[in-house]
Amino acid sequence: MATGKIVQVIGAVVDVEFPQDAVPRVYDALEVQNGNEHLVLEVQQQLGGGIVRTIAMGSSDGLRRGLDVKDLEHPIEVPVGKATLGRIMNVLGEPVDMKGEIGEEERWAIHRAAPSYEELSNSQELLETGIKVIDLMCPFAKGGKVGLFGGAGVGKTVNMMELIRNIAIEHSGYSVFAGVGERTREGNDFYHEMTDSNVIDKVSLVYGQMNEPPGNRLRVALTGLTMAEKFRDEGRDVLLFVDNIYRYTLAGTEVSALLGRMPSAVGYQPTLAEEMGVLQERITSTKTGSITSVQAVYVPADDLTDPSPATTFAHLDATVVLSRQIASLGIYPAVDPLDSTSRQLDPLVVGQEHYDTARGVQSILQRYQELKDIIAILGMDELSEEDKLVVARARKIQRFLSQPFFVAEVFTGSPGKYVSLKDTIRGFKGIMEGEYDHLPEQAFYMVGSIDEAVEKAKKL
């Protein structure tokens, strides 16, 4: 095991000099004793002359030139398998929940090759989420990739927690949650939410939060993914939740300049597309098992053309766009039904009835959007009878797209609802065909199925 010495420390980037004949490989892990703590470094570049440039996987406070560094001769390895379920780990797979050792039987390196083309499988099976607007407008495929796009504070994390709760309880599969650069409070809330719903023993939690050095945030997504790959290769259907994929990009940006790379557009790293591709190509389903992934994507300044969200778009099967405008109307989940898309929304996959209902809902909402200007200037009375009907139905649809969440019961004060796809289609089809024209629009706000709206109308 070769030993080197630290020659330079710039924030999270540490240069280490090794003997010429024992230079570590790129992505190898190095270990340094920093006071009474072990610090792991990951090799990023070989600079020549026996010097390697590394990223620290923890705080580099207290490091100084001349400290001895050991080459571990393998990439960072993390525990995988059932021992990780119900545990909270950091980027190195070390437990941070004070429940003792993980006690794993196997450790895998976090840098792995993506499955080959022959191993990939293609499934057209739908995954029901119990959230009306998602099941209707942008259905998820089993083994597909979903992105939750939204600016700050429109509900990405709450939507993700609801999805985990619904899928864990209704589908009873294993899930892996990677918290990448998000708030520690959310991680804490999430853990308690999972414990209260008795699904914690089906979830592995990996966190690299906002206060961590960029090395942690850059690699924690790979740590979570590696654990998910192990479950997949055992022949299971596993769910991988990443909150937030934008922080993964941001961590890369933070160290990119320190690694000596020229920045590209908007100051992002020049390797943005490649780094995203390396991660996304591994999140895939093989003939042995599937990984269905849901990734929250922060959209800087609500601009979907920013290079980071724009690069992520290309890899996804379904995009759920959360809109500040809809959130401001008090409609939660604040999913924009006109902006959200899914490759599964095809009559050959979801069936003709589902497809027609979804497209019908979109056309009514689109027409309402066009009429809004006229209403704002001239008022409702200037509209034709036909347009008045469209507006009335559109407003009912808009309210019916809202839904009380289980994980938000403390905020909304109303119990959460899980709505089956069959009930969702029946409800929206009924509104479009005018079966509920006689009900007031308030009856449709924050209810589950259409039957609840009818019941609510009787009490109004």
From Swiss-Prot:
Binding, ATP: 150-157
Matching CDD domains: ATP-synt_F1_beta_C, ATP-synt_F1_beta_N, F1-ATPase_beta_CD
Coiled-coil segments on the chain, per record: none
Pfam families on file: ATP-synt_ab (PF00006), ATP-synt_ab_N (PF02874), ATP-synt_VA_C (PF22919)
GO molecular function: ATP binding; ATP hydrolysis activity; proton-transporting ATP synthase activity, rotational mechanism
Gene3D superfamilies: 2.40.10.170, Bovine Mitochondrial F1-atpase, Atp Synthase Beta Chain, Chain D, domain 3, P-loop containing nucleotide triphosphate hydrolases
UniProt keyword terms in alphabetical order: ATP synthesis, ATP-binding, Cell inner membrane, Cell membrane, CF(1), Hydrogen ion transport, Ion transport, Membrane, Nucleotide-binding, Translocase, Transport
InterPro entries: AAA+_ATPase, ATP-synt_VA_C, ATP_synth_F1_bsu, ATPase_a/bsu_AS, ATPase_alpha/beta_chains, ATPase_F1/V1/A1_a/bsu_N, ATPase_F1/V1/A1_a/bsu_N_sf, ATPase_F1/V1/A1_a/bsu_nucl-bd
UniProt EC number: 7.1.2.2
Bilayer topology term: Peripheral membrane protein
SUPFAM superfamilies: C-terminal domain of alpha and beta subunits of F1 ATP synthase (SSF47917), N-terminal domain of alpha and beta subunits of F1 ATP synthase (SSF50615), P-loop containing nucleoside triphosphate hydrolases (SSF52540)
SMART domains for the chain: AAA
Cellular component annotations (GO), alphabetically ordered: plasma membrane; proton-transporting ATP synthase complex
Reaction(s) catalysed by this chain's protein: ATP + H2O + 4 H(+)(in) = ADP + phosphate + 5 H(+)(out)
Superkingdom: Bacteria
Intracellular or extracellular location(s): Cell inner membrane
Assembly mode: F-type ATPases have 2 components, CF(1) - the catalytic core - and CF(0) - the membrane proton channel. CF(1) has five subunits: alpha(3), beta(3), gamma(1), delta(1), epsilon(1). CF(0) has three main subunits: a(1), b(2) and c(9-12). The alpha and beta chains form an alternating ring which encloses part of the gamma chain. CF(1) is attached to CF(0) by a central stalk formed by the gamma and epsilon chains, while a peripheral stalk is formed by the delta and b chains.
Matches recorded under NCBIfam families: atpD (TIGR01039)
Protein's job: Produces ATP from ADP in the presence of a proton gradient across the membrane. The catalytic sites are hosted primarily by the beta subunits.
Family statement: Belongs to the ATPase alpha/beta chains family.
Annotated protein name in UniProt: ATP synthase subunit beta
Originating organism: Citrobacter koseri (strain ATCC BAA-895 / CDC 4225-83 / SGSC4696)
Encoding gene (name): atpD
